[in-house]
Curated annotation (Swiss-Prot):
HAMAP family: Formyl_trans. (6S)-5,6,7,8-tetrahydrofolate binds at S110, L111, L112, P113. GO terms for cellular component: cytosol. Keywords: Protein biosynthesis, Transferase. It comes from Streptococcus thermophilus (strain ATCC BAA-250 / LMG 18311). It catalyses: L-methionyl-tRNA(fMet) + (6R)-10-formyltetrahydrofolate = N-formyl-L-methionyl-tRNA(fMet) + (6S)-5,6,7,8-tetrahydrofolate + H(+). The keyword rRNA-binding does not apply. Coiled coil: none annotated. GO terms for molecular function: methionyl-tRNA formyltransferase activity. This is Methionyl-tRNA formyltransferase. Attaches a formyl group to the free amino group of methionyl-tRNA(fMet). The formyl group appears to play a dual role in the initiator identity of N-formylmethionyl-tRNA by promoting its recognition by IF2 and preventing the misappropriation of this tRNA by the elongation apparatus. The keyword Transferase applies. Its EC number is 2.1.2.9.
């Protein structure tokens, strides 16, 4: 039985860990995840999805604020594990830890060398890519730069968003890892170096990137909305106040960018640089998220055709 230290944090990682736990070839000797954090307006302390799963399986859990040079790292090395599997852990792994293992692989949610970094799924959708995927890669000191063990793609559909793609890619990553890992450990797979000329990056989304520019095409704005749902959520301004847009549809229509070109009791259509967006789910500043019909029957009832978003 191969002894593995698993490292991961979000639901994506928990799906991968779940796969390893169902495979009798692997013994998870430790789980490393990010510390519990305060989240939401109420600042409630919340554990990571990986920690929740580890607790349910009574696995040893480590949550160092910083792994490098920590007491926890020394303890992990002393476990005598065969290897490390990571999936969206959120910290760099020290060379000392990597060097102490027979193998260390990462499940990364992109088709490397494209989209190294922390937000590959967001950027794949925002950039209008036809497909996304997962790569099993060897861990090295440089971020997501290791040789590729295996890779698999799937299409991005218009109805997809970050949430749906996270779920799909988590399952794809889990299955690809279980399919690949035995042959890799046995030395039957020769990892392939990444093409340095094709490397792109996907850093965490900045606040500026969340803001919609209505001068862009409808397709670009549609992709941006989907590429930020359910987090961090795209936003614009309405009467000088922040206005979040969770969901919208790409529709035909012409008008001055950012201007309302159609309003009914159940729909609100905003012109873009090319085409238009029909808003579906929104959140005015200081209000809860709501369907567009509820918005138009409430705080948005006085909006008229010609009113402007983005200012």
């Amino acid at each position: 039985m191969t002894k593995i230290i698993f490292m991961g944090t979000p639901a994506f990682s928990a799906t991968v860990l779940e796969g390893l736990l169902t495979d009798e070839r692997y013994d998870i000797v430790a789980v490393v995840t990010q510390p519990d954090r305060a989240v939401g307006r109420k600042k409630e302390i919340r554990m990571t999805p990986v920690k929740e799963l580890a607790l349910a399986h009574e696995l040893p859990i480590y949550q160092p604020e910083k792994l490098s040079g920590s007491e926890e790292m020394a303890q992990l090395i002393s476990l005598g594990a065969d290897g490390i599997v990571t999936a969206a852990y959120g910290q760099f792994l020290p060379s000392k830890l990597l060097d102490s293992m027979d193998f260390a692989v990462n499940v990364h949610a992109s088709l490397l060398p494209k989209y190294r970094g922390g937000a590959p799924i967001h950027y794949a959708i925002i950039n209008g890519d036809a497909e996304a995927g997962v790569t099993i890669m060897e861990m090295v000191k440089e971020m997501d730069a290791g040789d590729m063990v295996s890779q698999k793609a799937l299409p991005i559909l218009d109805q997809d968003n970050v949430g749906t793609m996270f779920e799909k890619l988590a399952v794809l990553g889990r299955d690809l890892l279980l399919e690949t890992l035995p042959a890799y450990i046995a030395g039957e797979i020769k990892p392939v170096p990444q093409d340095a000329s094709q490397v792109t990056f996907s850093p965490n989304i900045s606040p500026e990137e969340e803001r919609l520019d209505w001068n862009k095409s409808g397709r670009d704005i549609f992709n941006q909305i989907r590429g930020m749902y359910p987090w961090p959520v795209a936003h614009t301004l309405l009467n000088g106040k922040r206005f979040k847009i969770y969901e919208g549809d790409l529709v035909e229509g012409q008008g001055q960018a950012g201007h309302i070109i159609e309003k009914t009791k159940k729909s609100l259509v905003v012109a873009t640089g090319q085409g238009a967006i029909s808003l579906k789910s929104v959140q005015p500043e200081g209000k809860p998220r709501m369907a567009i019909a509820d918005f138009l029957n409430g705080v948005g009832r006085n909006l008229e055709v010609g009113d402007v978003f983005g200012q």
